[in-house]
Every structure is written in C-alpha cells, then in structure tokens.
C-alpha cells in the first residue's frame, strides 16, 4: 500500500457512502444503473474470495469487508426497497458481452493458472469496464442529479489517485503487473470524459448535462 493508494481507497469509500446517502435521503435510485452495481459487486466477490484464508493486514481485511457489504446493500436497495424508482427502460447495456470478454481475457492471460488468480484477473478486467452500463444509461438520459454526478466524480478521483501509485511501484519496486496497468488505463479513459464534463458543469454550478 502507498499513500496514493490509501487516498484512492478513501475516495472510493466516499463515492460509495455519498451514493448511499443520496439513495436513503431521496428514497430513489432513479438514474442509477443496477447492472453497473451488480458488476461491481461481482468484482469485489471474485477479487476477495480469499478474504478469510489469506490475511494480509487489518486495513485490507476491513476495506474488503466494507466494499462487499456496502455494494451488496446498494444492490439490495435497488432490487427491493427502491425497485419502483429504478429506470429499467434506460438500463439496457448488454452486460453479457462484458462478462464474456472479461472471462476470456482472464483465461488467456492470468497472472498464473490457479483458480484464485484467474478470478483475480477476471475482477481486474471487469472493474475496468463495470461503469459502462452507468455511462450508457447517462448517455441515454442526457443528464443526471448533482449527487449522482458527485458519486461518479469521486469514482474518477479514486481511479486517478491510483496512477501515481502505479508509477511509484514501477519506479521503486520494479514491479509491473501488466493486466492491472492496462485495465487501469482503460478505466481511467472511461472516467476521463465524464470528469471533463463534470468540471465544465457541476463545478460551475450548472446542472450536469452531456453535450449533444
């Protein structure tokens, strides 16, 4: 863990709890992609399957528990409590293509051919594109609430803070995990366009709206 990865984790937590606050306060999940959140839940479950038998540190243990529990709760709210407010007609991204592609990549190029490492590689690829259904939904609706935009920007910040973390690991430890670097670049690019629009709208007091 580095200073930048810790900051990234804090931004990630802020994004999750900002979203939960928005959902609980407004009692709606309108504008949110259930498909994206189910993909993120799958990311955490497949990545942290070794949670109870490969103990690394108390920090990692607690963070993994929080990520799984909070994402599970978000999915529960969207599937049960707030289901009447879910915009299913806009959440139409074909996630089977994402899942199939990530599974193939995990089998072709895992860090090693063990079940845990294949699942870890799958989770890395999946996290890089799990936001696509949300971005696609946003593209279809054309706009979103400010709190949802804040959540997505916090996710952008989380990803952005991991860039100096990668640079540090390469420069100091000479350790490069090609899959993680490539997937991280893909994820950064996907969030990048959103961050530009966010800066031009929400940070200037305007309603978030995608350009026509």
UniProtKB/Swiss-Prot annotation:
<keyword id="KW-0256">Endoplasmic reticulum</keyword>
<protein>
    <recommendedName>
        <fullName>ER lumen protein-retaining receptor</fullName>
    </recommendedName>
</protein>
<feature type="topological domain" description="Cytoplasmic">
    <location>
        <begin position="200"/>
        <end position="212"/>
    </location>
</feature>
<keyword id="KW-1133">Transmembrane helix</keyword>
<dbReference type="GO" id="GO:0005783">
    <property type="term" value="C:endoplasmic reticulum"/>
</dbReference>
<dbReference type="InterPro" id="IPR000133">
    <property type="entry name" value="ER_ret_rcpt"/>
</dbReference>
<feature type="transmembrane region" description="Helical">
    <location>
        <begin position="118"/>
        <end position="137"/>
    </location>
</feature>
<keyword id="KW-0472">Membrane</keyword>
<dbReference type="GO" id="GO:0046923">
    <property type="term" value="F:ER retention sequence binding"/>
</dbReference>
<keyword id="KW-0653">Protein transport</keyword>
<dbReference type="GO" id="GO:0006890">
    <property type="term" value="P:retrograde vesicle-mediated transport, Golgi to endoplasmic reticulum"/>
</dbReference>
<keyword id="KW-0813">Transport</keyword>
<dbReference type="GO" id="GO:0005801">
    <property type="term" value="C:cis-Golgi network"/>
</dbReference>
<keyword id="KW-0931">ER-Golgi transport</keyword>
<dbReference type="GO" id="GO:0045015">
    <property type="term" value="F:HDEL sequence binding"/>
</dbReference>
<dbReference type="GO" id="GO:0005794">
    <property type="term" value="C:Golgi apparatus"/>
</dbReference>
<feature type="topological domain" description="Lumenal">
    <location>
        <begin position="54"/>
        <end position="61"/>
    </location>
</feature>
<feature type="topological domain" description="Cytoplasmic">
    <location>
        <begin position="22"/>
        <end position="35"/>
    </location>
</feature>
<keyword id="KW-0812">Transmembrane</keyword>
<feature type="transmembrane region" description="Helical">
    <location>
        <begin position="36"/>
        <end position="53"/>
    </location>
</feature>
<comment type="similarity">
    <text>Belongs to the ERD2 family.</text>
</comment>
<feature type="topological domain" description="Lumenal">
    <location>
        <begin position="169"/>
        <end position="178"/>
    </location>
</feature>
<feature type="transmembrane region" description="Helical">
    <location>
        <begin position="179"/>
        <end position="199"/>
    </location>
</feature>
<feature type="transmembrane region" description="Helical">
    <location>
        <begin position="97"/>
        <end position="110"/>
    </location>
</feature>
<dbReference type="Pfam" id="PF00810">
    <property type="entry name" value="ER_lumen_recept"/>
</dbReference>
<feature type="topological domain" description="Lumenal">
    <location>
        <begin position="111"/>
        <end position="117"/>
    </location>
</feature>
<dbReference type="GO" id="GO:0006621">
    <property type="term" value="P:protein retention in ER lumen"/>
</dbReference>
<dbReference type="GO" id="GO:0005789">
    <property type="term" value="C:endoplasmic reticulum membrane"/>
</dbReference>
<feature type="transmembrane region" description="Helical">
    <location>
        <begin position="150"/>
        <end position="168"/>
    </location>
</feature>
<feature type="topological domain" description="Cytoplasmic">
    <location>
        <begin position="138"/>
        <end position="149"/>
    </location>
</feature>
<feature type="transmembrane region" description="Helical">
    <location>
        <begin position="62"/>
        <end position="80"/>
    </location>
</feature>
<feature type="transmembrane region" description="Helical">
    <location>
        <begin position="3"/>
        <end position="21"/>
    </location>
</feature>
<feature type="topological domain" description="Lumenal">
    <location>
        <begin position="1"/>
        <end position="2"/>
    </location>
</feature>
<dbReference type="GO" id="GO:0006886">
    <property type="term" value="P:intracellular protein transport"/>
</dbReference>
<keyword id="KW-0675">Receptor</keyword>
<comment type="function">
    <text>Required for the retention of luminal endoplasmic reticulum proteins. Determines the specificity of the luminal ER protein retention system. Also required for normal vesicular traffic through the Golgi.</text>
</comment>
<feature type="topological domain" description="Cytoplasmic">
    <location>
        <begin position="81"/>
        <end position="96"/>
    </location>
</feature>
